[in-house]
Amino acid sequence: MDFTEAYADTCSTVGLAAREGNVKVLRKLLKKGRSIDVADNRGWMPIHEASYHNSVECLRMLIRADSSENYIKTKTFEGFCALHLAASQGHWKIIQILLEAGADPNATTLEETTPLFLAVENGQIDVLRLLLRYGANVNGSHSMCGWNALHQASFQGNAEIIKLLLKKGANKECQDDFGITPLFVAAQYGKLESLSILISSGADVNCQALDKATPLFIAAQEGHTECVELLLSSGADPDLYCNEDNWQLPIHAAAQMGHTKILDLLIPLTNRVCDTGPNKVSPVYSAVLGGHEECLEMLLQSGYSPDAQMCLVFGFSSPLCMAFQKDCDFFGIVNILLKYGAQLNELHLAYCLKYERFSVFRYFLKKCCPSTPWDHISEFINHAIKAQTKYKEWLPSLLLAGFDPLNLLCSSWIDSVSDDILIFTLEFTNWRRLPPAVEKMLSARASNSSWALQQHIASVPSLTHLCRLEIWSHLKLEHLQSDGFIRQLPLPRSLHDYLLYAEVLRMNEVPELAVFQDGEISETT
């Protein structure tokens, strides 16, 4: 039911007179014996109307008509007494009259809100002084979540009220239901003056909420540079862990949210154990997660490792692997990581296949030859199988870069890929001299496959093909990063083409591969 809207047809004539401050009409109604305790749809009686609308004389008349404690303290359906309503509007005289008549300065609404809290919320310092004079409790919970008046004053940045509450004995370390103190609130919302007052009063700058977040962490997260500076100069610890897993620090928050000025403050002060330490998470991951290139470069420039440590928290083996999840920031982040020496491996090639970044796949092959043995060959093959429908965009590049096709010829590849792909893979081998285990799997596959696959396996490789394989066996992997080395061999162009499998590519209608250039990758790479 909506208790915020007053329905005109539910308000009594006495209530309406009190609302309008019509003393003359109210006096006549009282003389006629009209009731003063008829409630409207919100549970508001005439005493509530007079208090909320600052009808001083009407309130006095109502109290003279019934000065009982029950009437003075009567509540609306939401648990507001007349004192709450007057405090919410800052009606000093009304509040004085109610308090003198016996109103409870510590009364609470259904949401456990006190008149003192409402006075603070509305910035009514004179009302606050009056309530305190009549015994309002400056401590304790003033709202349902345990948030009290000092929290509210700190949130609003009301310096006068903060000073008054502290002077009257407010607990500067009071916590709400989430373990948050007023100082934490000031840091969270960037209330620099509130923060300064609380620090000067001795409030703990290293307090922690129930989730272990600190004022420094929350200020760094929210981008309040001046608050971060004040906290650091006041003894806030940048190495105090801010989560249960003991890895999250203020530097992570600044990096993830892109607050470069704060990051610049924290980099020289933060212990480097988070860089590559086991069971930690490098802030490099945070910068990549947030997609903030400037923060990423700041960290790497200051000496943080571009490879970091394996991150079980986010499920990535390196920041470069995480970068694949960043659509709009991908190329900028990858370029920065490579610029600072990020090590490429087969997992990065696998992620290229997973996210169908085939141009980047070819670029990575150029930057990092597929050296053996691979530590994550199974994961690579799984992604390769899923990307088989677009094999022409990546498989030729992989095999021409010197990747041993025998690494592909495992049971999952042989059983899963199409005949065309399997035949294409075999073109880079001597298919009549394969390991027995591979021959057995191919024979089983061929028995249930097309005539083309059966014919290919049964055929004898040409002498020229065997010579090609022999020449390739003497090439180093770095010679195969591009076709440049082979093109420079003192051989006719037709032999260059043959060594580069031109006839195989042509037969399989593989498009001409892009000519790679050194430099940064982009959407057009």
From Swiss-Prot:
InterPro entries the record matches: Ankyrin_rpt (IPR002110), Ankyrin_rpt-contain_sf (IPR036770), ASB3_SOCS (IPR037329), SOCS_box (IPR001496), SOCS_box-like_dom_sf (IPR036036)
Pathway: Protein modification; protein ubiquitination
Repeat among keywords: yes
Keywords (A to Z) from UniProt: ANK repeat, Repeat, Ubl conjugation pathway
Gene3D superfamilies from the UniProt entry: Ankyrin repeat-containing domain, SOCS box
SUPFAM superfamilies the UniProt entry points to: Ankyrin repeat, SOCS box-like
Residue stretches of each ANK repeat: 9-38, 42-71, 78-107, 111-140, 145-174, 178-207, 211-240, 246-275, 279-308, 315-346, 348-373
An individual GO BP term: protein ubiquitination
SMART domains, A to Z: ANK, SOCS_box
UniProt superkingdom: Eukaryota
Domain SOCS box residue range list: 441-505
PANTHER family: ANKYRIN REPEAT AND PROTEIN KINASE DOMAIN-CONTAINING PROTEIN, ANKYRIN REPEAT AND SOCS BOX CONTAINING 3
Subunit structure: Interacts with ELOB and TNFRSF1B.
Function: Probable substrate-recognition component of a SCF-like ECS (Elongin-Cullin-SOCS-box protein) E3 ubiquitin-protein ligase complex which mediates the ubiquitination and subsequent proteasomal degradation of target proteins. Recognizes TNFRSF1B.
Free-text note on domains in this protein's UniProt record: The SOCS box domain mediates the interaction with the Elongin BC complex, an adapter module in different E3 ubiquitin-protein ligase complexes.
Protein family per UniProt: Belongs to the ankyrin SOCS box (ASB) family.
Protein name: Ankyrin repeat and SOCS box protein 3
Origin organism lineage: Eukaryota, Metazoa, Chordata, Craniata, Vertebrata
Protein encoded by which gene: ASB3
